Amino acid sequence: MIRKCTEHGYFRGGSCLQCKRPGRYLLDDNKEEKLGRFVSGTLRHFPESAGVTMDRFGWVNINDFCDVMRKRYSWMRKEYLYALVESDEKGRYEIRNSRIRARYGHSVNIDLDYRESDSPYLYYGASPEEVDVLLENGIFPIKQRYVHLSTSYEKAVEVALIHTENPVILQIDAFKAQEDGISLKLATDDIVLAERIPPEYLFVVEE
């Protein structure tokens, strides 16, 4: 559910996290999920099939995008798209100058115009079965365009637990990798993107 607080903006749930007021109702869980799936799919995976034009950096005109969504969902309003983006705690999307894009998770080929990460170390969670292969061959993207790295050990554990019960966390020597010419782009406060990470920069974090 998405609602809007007059003082603190859009939020998800029954009450504003800051002032605890209920705010104005906008979207129920069902509509929120439908919009979220379509926005994610279009901006990350199938813009052409959805009928929108995406530039090389992943941007889509927000008015054109809303027109496409209205054809699919008659109840769609432009405000709902802003509400979906601004209430998203994971920072999956950004809106700028009447354009919208996904910040990470792409399978379509886009260029990254983010700033370089300044974290000396980054982290990647893997299953015990994957670790030896990664240490030998490095980390490559599988279903996505870029490798997704975490800026903290804790976040890497959180992400890895989605896929495995006993994650092994790899530490990446980001400073050395960047010195050697590997680009590490900061997508959000928690996520850094890379084309690949060669094995010489990987180390297992001992518990």
UniProtKB/Swiss-Prot annotation:
Matches recorded under SUPFAM superfamilies: ADP-ribosylation
An example Gene Ontology molecular-function term: tRNA 2'-phosphotransferase activity
EC top class named in words: transferase
Pfam families in alphabetical order: PTS_2-RNA
InterPro entries: Ptrans_KptA/Tpt1, RNA_2'-PTrans_C, RNA_2'-PTrans_KptA, RNA_2'-PTrans_N
Key words, A-Z: NAD, Transferase
Disulfide bond entries: none
UniProt EC number: 2.7.1.-
GO biological process terms, semicolon-separated: tRNA splicing, via endonucleolytic cleavage and ligation
PANTHER family: PUTATIVE PHOSPHOTRANSFERASE, TRNA 2'-PHOSPHOTRANSFERASE 1
NCBIfam families named among the record's database cross-references: PRK00819.1-5
Homology family: Belongs to the KptA/TPT1 family.
Function text: Removes the 2'-phosphate from RNA via an intermediate in which the phosphate is ADP-ribosylated by NAD followed by a presumed transesterification to release the RNA and generate ADP-ribose 1''-2''-cyclic phosphate (APPR>P). May function as an ADP-ribosylase.
The name this protein goes by in its record: Probable RNA 2'-phosphotransferase
Organism, scientific name: Methanosarcina barkeri (strain Fusaro / DSM 804)
Organism taxonomic ancestry: Archaea, Methanobacteriati, Methanobacteriota, Stenosarchaea group, Methanomicrobia
Gene: kptA
